[in-house]
Every structure is written in structure tokens, then in C-alpha cells.
């Protein structure tokens, strides 16, 4: 059973108002769950860094107009909005620092968390294993059922298009083998879920009655 602990509830309560745009609130919670699962498999990581970072990583999008926000991450983007991705990282780091200090997180941890958030999308390498898990959790979310539904809504895609787009971004760019295995399993389930054969199973037919 995964639940937010006392520290993470305190962080979440302060972060939530900054995440109430473009489904970032639900995205961050699902990514938190993914991070918790990865932490059980990667003993060298520090949950005191990873979990606050994943809850706070997208708070900076609150400082960007939502329409421009989507243009910055669209699959057909032309690069003219790339500066907004950087802005959300910088502003997210600023917001995260303020929240972490209010919660009373140790200064040494604050510095590590903020460093991860500042560059979590644009930095192509991982600073360390904690950064790798944050990056991977963020990306693996894309191939969850929630992630695919959100991407469909954002960009007007059908289920197959969303799955192909999300799958392309949620494997090769991952840093940990554990996240790659998780992503591959989620993609496999999504593929089976869309098959004609599954649609004709008793349980599916029974559910429609």
C-alpha cells in the first residue's frame, strides 16, 4: 500500500496550488507512486531526496500560460517555446526551495532536491541515482493509463496514437533498468488492452451488459 507520509503530505499541501494546471497535480501523484516502486528496487537511492523532488518537479509550470505550456511540449513543436521548458525548471526550483524550507527539510537535502528540479527535463544526463529515478518516474508516467488519457486530451490523439507517442518517449530515454522494465510492462498491457481478442472476452462483454 502506497500512501504519502507526514513529510510528503506537508509538501503536497503546499505544492498542490502550483500544480493545478495541465493535470500536473495528478501527474505528480502518479509519478510519486512510480518513484516509490522504483525505490524498492534501487537500494542506493535516497527517498528523502527522490520523493520531495518528484512531488515538486513541475510546480514551475504554474508560472507559464497553459496554452503556451502545451505548445512547449507538443510533439510537433518547432523549438520556439523551448525557453518555457527552462523557465518552468528554474521557477520550479525556486518554488520548491520555498516549500522545502517551510516544511523544515535539511539544507543539504534542499540543495540536492533543487538541483534535480532545475534541469529535470532539459538535462540529458542524470546527476546521480536520485536524479535518474526522478527523471524516470516522470517519463514512465506517460505510458500509464492516466498518462495516455491526458496526452490524448492535450493533443487530440486517439488511443493508438497516444500510446505510440508515449512509448517512444518512455523507454530509450530512461536511465535505470528497473524503469525500463516497468515501462515495457505498461506498454505491453496497453497493447493487449486494445486488441480485438480482449474486447471479445467474456469479462469485457459481460461488463457492457
What role is predicted for each listed range?
Residues 23, 47, 84, 88:
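Conserved acidic
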Residues 1-3, 19-29, 33-45, 56, ...:
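Divalent metal-dependent phosphate-bond-processing catalytic cores, especially two-metal-ion Mg2+/Mn2+ enzymes
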Residues 6-30, 69-83:
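Active-site flanking loop/helix segments enriched in acidic
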Residues 42-52, 101-117, 130:
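Acidic/histidine metal-binding catalytic segments
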Residues 30-34, 38, 86-102:
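An active-site-proximal "capping" alpha-helix that borders the catalytic cofactor pocket
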Residues 47-76, 92, 112-122, 138:
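His-Asp-centered metal-binding catalytic motifs of divalent-metal-dependent phosphohydrolases/nucleases
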